[in-house]
Design a protein with these regions (language model features):
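Terminal, non-globular segments
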Residues: 1-172
């Protein structure tokens, strides 16, 4: 338990540094930023305690907010994604993660993985962009910006997942 918690904290620090030092300096067309740090939450084991998951989400989101000076926007978006993560796993796997303590998350098909990643990254980008703008008159511009950011984040996430494949049973 303690060893896995320490490993998760180390992984969280890695994603914070990756986001802050590399991906915060990438701005596509002055329009969209990739948010790769969300992979920390998306790749945590499905058996992770719900409260620990929300705590990890708040911690990584808050750390990104501190470095980006965004006043809680990333913390909100990351906690929202963490909150919606298990219900989406339940929906995609036809199993209840809360009852079983574990799921067939590691055995997701490519389509299930794709839906899981796309939906949660899109939710993250939409929530960040909507809160940052606080305007509805540019709604379609916000949606366009979110879709471009989501696409870039998904491509970078796929590169990361293919470069560092998760362990089948213990990692995810």
């Amino acid at each position: 338990m303690v060893q896995s918690s320490l490993a998760n904290v180390g992984k969280m620090i890695f994603f914070i540094l990756l986001q802050v030092l590399i991906f915060n300096n990438i701005n596509f067309w002055g329009y969209a930023n990739p948010y790769i740090y969300i992979l920390f939450i998306l790749t945590l084991p499905s058996s992770t305690n719900r409260y620990a998951l929300l705590l990890y989400a708040f911690a990584i989101g808050f750390a990104i907010d501190v470095f980006e000076h965004t006043g809680g926007v990333n913390a909100f978006a990351t906690v929202l994604v963490a909150y919606l993560r298990n219900p989406l796993i339940n929906l995609l796997s036809n199993q209840n993660v809360d009852e079983l303590g574990t799921s067939k998350f590691a055995n997701f098909s490519f389509l299930q993985w794709s839906v899981y990643i796309v939906v949660l990254i899109l939710i993250q980008h939409l929530s960040i962009d909507l809160i940052e703008s606080l305007q509805w008159h540019n709604f379609w511009l916000i949606v366009e910006r979110s879709l471009i950011g989501t696409l870039i984040s998904i491509i970078l996430s796929a590169i990361y997942i293919l470069s560092f494949p998760p362990k089948r049973q213990s990692e995810i």
